[in-house]
């Protein structure tokens, strides 16, 4: 929790200057060929691999992810998403003739405003900056003001890759000043935002007067359905660890464990044992342990929600305070509540920490009803040994992604949510298309 450095926050004048640079660069960058942009992306891939360790260390320093996790997931996203977008661009069609004889052109949308969060800094930067530039658009990036190190490093990498002056612009600043000025700016044609639902609503409102395109990736309270016919030991322990991953600071974390009553007691035993065995340690150490929460604000929020949980439900493991031996830093005990009802606050509100709630269900129909009883719809998870049931249940879950029996996210696949978890999709072909306009030629 010590200070790692200082940055200068921008203001509205800085936004105007950055947008002007992006607007001027768009005049020529939009005319580059797909081959030109593929070469630039290939250069960026080479540089990202060369500076990979720097990227991982920066993320660990600025947001506290354990260094092993920073390498295997946080920094790795900078490579994986880039490779996914390179494939998408290679396979994209700038020109397509319809059966009617009309021709569709896919063109860059223009100047894009990009706002990214602190919890997965390079993951989100890559999901926005790369498709914008791949499409021939130019952009202004405002990363979280709390994680400037990886963003600054990424700006250096883009410069070294050869992207032209003004195509990419990095502007540090806060949301109310810089973020709002970007959203309101008449020369920004698109805003892409990742963060809280509250902040995403503000971006949408600020963007309304200029009728710009807005894509949002927001919060989640993802359900994880445990059916009695799955491998309980493997799938329950894996589910608990997935909830705790990144210290629970992931918008798609499976934080609601919905359990079939016939195996409920066995699941409680496995979940408790898994949480008790989950190590917590310093982020600079190698290993599969959990690091601290991001900052005091986040720590206080999580502690407050644990207090709420103690009033609402029964504590299975964990609780208030810091783990023994970790009084210095924003460490939290991995915590699980049992016998939770889905109308409780701990089942409805995003906690953003290593806190899991366990909710029993009696049958498949009730499981689906509970799973969908949330304002969010970013992801869902289900564990079953019956493949037909898996497809049947997945088709009824209102979420942008369904992870079945531990199936993980693959680079190049679309990511995004239903309901108040946002709109638009990030990653691969669909993520590229969000940064394009469609023009129809009638002959």
Predicted regions and their residues:
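Short acidic active-site motifs
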Residues: 14, 177-178, 366
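ALDH superfamily catalytic-core signature
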Residues: 198-341, 404
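Rossmann-like NAD(P) dinucleotide-binding subdomain of oxidoreductase/dehydrogenase enzymes
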Residues: 94-234, 361
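Short, well-ordered beta-strand elements within core beta-sheets of diverse protein domains
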Residues: 3-10, 24-31, 78, 114, ...
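Conserved C-terminal structural/oligomerization subdomain of aldehyde/semialdehyde dehydrogenase
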Residues: 2-6, 188, 324, 328-443
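Short, structured beta/alpha segment
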Residues: 1-57, 61, 233
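Residue-level signal for inorganic ion chemistry
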Residues: 1, 37, 59, 82, ...
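Long amphipathic alpha-helix in the N-terminal Rossmann-like dinucleotide-binding domain
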Residues: 42-53, 67-92
């Amino acid at each position: 929790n010590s200070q790692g450095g200082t940055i200068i926050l921008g203001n509205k004048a800085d936004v105007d200057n950055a947008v002007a640079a992006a607007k001027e660069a768009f005049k020529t960058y939009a005319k580059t060929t797909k081959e030109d942009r593929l070469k630039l992306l290939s250069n960026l891939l080479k540089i990202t691999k060369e500076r990979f360790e720097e990227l991982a260390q920066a993320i660990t320093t600025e947001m506290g992810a354990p260094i092993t996790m920073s390498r295997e997931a946080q920094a790795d996203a900078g490579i994986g998403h880039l490779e996914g977008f390179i494939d998408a661009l290679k396979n994209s069609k700038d020109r397509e003739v319809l059966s009617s004889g009309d021709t569709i052109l896919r063109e860059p949308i223009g100047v894009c405003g990009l706002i990214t969060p602190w919890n997965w800094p390079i993951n989100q930067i890559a999901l926005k900056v790369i498709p914008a530039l791949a499409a021939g658009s130019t952009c202004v990036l405002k990363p979280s003001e709390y994680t400037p190190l990886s963003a600054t490093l990424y700006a250096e990498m883009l410069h070294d890759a050869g992207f032209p002056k003004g195509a990419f612009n990095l502007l540090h600043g806060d949301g109310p000043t810089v973020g709002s000025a970007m959203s309101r700016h008449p020369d920004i044609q698109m805003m892409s935002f990742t963060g809280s639902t509250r902040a995403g609503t503000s971006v949408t409102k600020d963007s309304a007067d200029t009728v710009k395109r807005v894509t949002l990736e927001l919060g989640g309270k993802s359900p994880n359905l445990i059916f009695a016919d799955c491998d309980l030991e493997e799938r329950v322990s894996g589910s608990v660890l997935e909830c705790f991953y990144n210290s629970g600071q992931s918008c798609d974390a499976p934080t609601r464990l919905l359990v079939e009553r016939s195996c409920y007691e066995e699941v409680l035993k496995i979940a408790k044992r898994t949480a008790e065995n989950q190590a917590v340690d310093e982020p600079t150490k190698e290993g599969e342990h959990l690091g601290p929460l991001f900052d005091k604000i986040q720590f206080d929020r999580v502690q407050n929600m644990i207090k709420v949980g103690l009033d609402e439900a029964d504590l299975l493991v964990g609780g208030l305070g810091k783990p023994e031996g970790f009084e210095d830093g924003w460490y939290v005990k991995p915590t699980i509540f049992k016998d939770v009802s889905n109308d409780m606050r701990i089942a409805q509100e995003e906690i953003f920490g290593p806190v899991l709630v366990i909710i029993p269900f009696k049958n498949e129909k009730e499981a689906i009803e509970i799973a969908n009883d949330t304002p969010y719809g970013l992801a869902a998870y289900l564990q079953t040994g019956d493949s037909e049931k898996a497809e049947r249940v997945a088709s009824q879950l209102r979420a942008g992604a369904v992870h079945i029996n531990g199936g993980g996210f693959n680079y190049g696949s679309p990511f995004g949510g239903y309901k108040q978890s946002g709109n638009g999709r990030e990653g691969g072909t669909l993520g590229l298309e969000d940064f394009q306009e469609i023009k129809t030629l009638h002959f």
